[in-house]
Amino acid sequence: MIKGIAGVGGTALGVGGGVAAPPVSAAAVGSTLLAGKGVCLGLGLGLGAWGPVLLGVAGLACAASLCDYLKNRKAQAEASAEPA
């Protein structure tokens, strides 16, 4: 063991050694809301607070499009199943 490089309890600092970060601070590293950087997605797109809004609008548009597609597909299947 190298002098002066000791962790908690005398273990050498290396793989598995050292002090574990508390869960809240570990979560704050990955979360922009907990880190105090404001409301943003943190993707580096430069959208700021508009990022979550645009993502929500895009998600709603995709969901509406999917529902419309499934409804039309079901109507076409019922129309082709009816005898002419």
From Swiss-Prot:
This is Magnetosome protein MamG. Signal peptide: none annotated. The gene is mamG. GO terms for cellular component: magnetosome membrane. Keywords: Biomineralization, Magnetosome, Membrane, Transmembrane, Transmembrane helix. Its main location: membrane. Residues 1-3, 62-84 are cytoplasmic. It is found in: Magnetosome membrane. Residues 25-40 are lumenal. It comes from the Bacteria. Residues 41-48 are annotated as: LG repeat. Induction: Part of the probable 4 gene mamGFDC operon. It comes from Magnetospirillum gryphiswaldense (strain DSM 6361 / JCM 21280 / NBRC 15271 / MSR-1).
